[in-house]
Amino acid sequence: MILDEIVAQKKIQLKKDMSRITIEGWKQKIKRPGIHKPLDFYGALKNNGDISIIAEVKKASPSKGIIKEDFDPLKIAKEYVESDIQAISVLTERNFFKGDEDYLVKIRQFCPLPILRKDFIIDLWQIYESRYIGADAILLIVSLLSDEELKKFQIVANILGMQCLVEVHDERELERALESGARIIGINNRDLRTFEVDLKNTEKLMNRIPNDRVVVSESGIKDTEDLKYLKELGVDAVLIGETFMRARSISEKIREFKAV
């Protein structure tokens, strides 16, 4: 399964990365003056008064290959900022999504919006790294973590001032996310094991989530009809990547979506 391959590669990459700096090393770096103070990701999505948009900087995916050939992460992020969306998601996974931590570092330098680090986080080391490179929130995928890890990772992220988008795909994962105390729940409409997409997954899980949580619908949002459907369901936010990456004009596509 592709998810198993991604995690296996992530473990190999992490072993190399962790050999150059320890968690203690990250802790010291985080204390340096001038390090970005995390923004309120939850507040940006919940208090918008309308459905919020998290726009993603995404070059490729395992299911689609290269999505955007003329990929300029800084230009894309600037267009997002100018389009008055609520948050930006930056893919940093290198092997399968062609992302890079450096994209986030550079976008952080000019971006006034909360930034979500989208990666496969399986070790505390990555959480400290995320804080140092400028993330305001991190993605935690429930299916990759034990109950203990899910709770501990959120606690550590919160202590560091960051928030977590806790991603689920089915009822059991949602139950685990809620039990862990997750405040921002991402419902992935894509099954990460088969890569099949069904927007109705959001509808199926939504009514099980308390009103004080932020609900984010992720994957498969292609047009204004999809957005209208999700808005009528009452989701707080949508995470959109591929649709914006394939658009002839990102800003025009966002304008269309915001008019819904």
UniProtKB/Swiss-Prot annotation:
It is an enzyme of class 4 (lyase). Keywords: Amino-acid biosynthesis, Aromatic amino acid biosynthesis, Decarboxylase, Lyase, Tryptophan biosynthesis. GO terms for biological process: L-tryptophan biosynthetic process. Pathway: Amino-acid biosynthesis; L-tryptophan biosynthesis; L-tryptophan from chorismate: step 4/5. It catalyses: 1-(2-carboxyphenylamino)-1-deoxy-D-ribulose 5-phosphate + H(+) = (1S,2R)-1-C-(indol-3-yl)glycerol 3-phosphate + CO2 + H2O. GO terms for molecular function: indole-3-glycerol-phosphate synthase activity; phosphoribosylanthranilate isomerase activity. Pfam families: IGPS (PF00218). Its EC number is 4.1.1.48. InterPro entries: Aldolase_TIM (IPR013785), Indole-3-glycerol_P_synth (IPR045186), Indole-3-glycerol_P_synth_dom (IPR013798), Indole-3-GlycerolPSynthase_CS (IPR001468), RibuloseP-bd_barrel (IPR011060). Gene3D superfamilies: Aldolase class I. It comes from the Bacteria. Belongs to the TrpC family. PANTHER family: INDOLE-3-GLYCEROL-PHOSPHATE SYNTHASE, TRYPTOPHAN BIOSYNTHESIS PROTEIN. This is Indole-3-glycerol phosphate synthase.
